[in-house]
Structure formats: C-alpha cells, structure tokens
C-alpha cells in the first residue's frame, strides 16, 4: 500500500567553494501527515557525496544502506553533538511538525536522503525522500520543500554497518 506523505525541509545551512572539513548547521523542518504518524518512529538523515551522479528515484525505492557504501556518506553532527554518517531523530508525537539541526560540511553537489523508519524492533524502512543540494553555503540558504515520501514497507535493514 502506498501513501504519499509530504516531508517539508527548510535548509538554512553551511559556505563556500568546495567541500571542506568545516561543518555548519543545516536546519530541517519536517511535517508529516497525521494519517501515517503512528507508523513512523524515527527519521534517518544522510547526505551523499556526488549528488548529481545519483538517481533520486532509485535511491527512494529501498533502504539507502542496501544501495551505497557508508564511505559515500558525509560525516554529520546534530545539535546535541552526536555525530555519524547517518543521524536518527525520533518523530514528533502525533505527527506534529518538528525542527532539526544537522551540521553538514560546506560544499557542493550533495544528495540529502531522509528515511522514514518504523517504531518497531527491529527497525524497518517505510519510505524516503531524496533531494539534491547543489551548494551548502555559510549563510542562510533558500528553503527547500522536500520530495514527498512514498510509504512502501520494505524488508531491507536501514542500518549502516559501523
């Protein structure tokens, strides 16, 4: 069963010429339809290098972990100082809008993937949104409305090996 879910992202991010080790905040505002809110337990955020070489349609079909190597992902950091190549954020109660802050390295040509994950154990993939980030600047960036998530339960494991 497929249900489109609108995932909204406001990008307020990181600068400059090419990718550097400097990471600056990327703000994400996520809104989820209340109709599917009870199914979603968390969002997993990942940013891929070489975004224009990626096919977002293909990346959204199944777990990102089954399609790319963890070395293709940028190192991210959340507002609490947790870091990793993927970051997980619990969904807001009742599907309420939520704001996230993720430090993304300054640079160009990225693909941002947000996976909706179940609250079950083990965690299962529900669907994802993929968006191209042409440039992450040091100032305020234009707001991005993310591609809708098509909820399609898959049997893949969304966890990247560490």
Regions from the language model: what does each represent?
Residues 23-44:
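Post-signal peptide N-terminal segment of mature Sec-exported envelope proteins
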Residues 26-30, 114, 127:
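One face of beta-strands
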